[in-house]
């Protein structure tokens, strides 16, 4: 058990922060791809709204999933940090310095803050892109109604 705590103490921050960094890079790549696609898509080239929906909504789930799960990844880092703090308190003998405990707990909370920092832009981008998807769907419906009237 001691080896597990030593491993967590050495590598948990790297793992959690690395995972959040990876999530943010993936999210940004998907946002850029979606933005560029939605900016140039021509709804007139689609014969059905279902085909349009498939193209409009591609990668949107990834952006939403990252936004929804990043706080949980950060929370996992915080829980591990608090667990390690309690482990160190338990193995510290009888001397417990409150300032050291507070320092460790505050450092443990950085993972949650980073998770929220990834989640907020993800959800903002998701909602903004979702609006562009809806506008393109409405454009297709208007064109479809105009074709039906002709």
From Swiss-Prot:
Known partners and oligomeric status: The accessory proteins ExbB and ExbD seem to form a complex with TonB.
Protein name: Biopolymer transport protein ExbB
Family: Belongs to the ExbB/TolQ family.
InterPro entries: ExbB/TolQ_transport, MotA_ExbB_proton_chnl, TonB_ExbB_2
Coiled-coil residue windows: none
Keyword flag Iron-sulfur: no
GO cellular component: plasma membrane
Subcellular location: Cell inner membrane
Membrane topology: Multi-pass membrane protein
């Amino acid at each position: 058990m001691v080896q597990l705590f030593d491993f967590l103490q050495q590598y948990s921050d790297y793992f959690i922060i690395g995972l959040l960094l990876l999530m943010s890079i993936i999210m940004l790549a998907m946002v850029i791809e979606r933005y560029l696609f939605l900016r140039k898509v021509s709804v007139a080239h689609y014969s059905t709204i279902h085909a349009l929906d498939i193209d409009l909504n591609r990668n949107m789930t990834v952006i939403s999933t990252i936004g929804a799960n990043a706080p949980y990844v950060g929370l996992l880092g915080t829980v591990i940090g608090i667990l390690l703090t309690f482990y160190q308190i338990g193995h510290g003998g009888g001397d417990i310095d409150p300032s050291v405990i507070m320092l460790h707990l505050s450092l443990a909370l950085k993972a949650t803050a980073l998770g929220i920092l990834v989640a907020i832009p993800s959800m903002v981008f998701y909602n903004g892109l979702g609006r562009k998807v809806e506008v393109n769907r409405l454009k297709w419906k208007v064109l479809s109604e105009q074709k039906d009237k002709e």
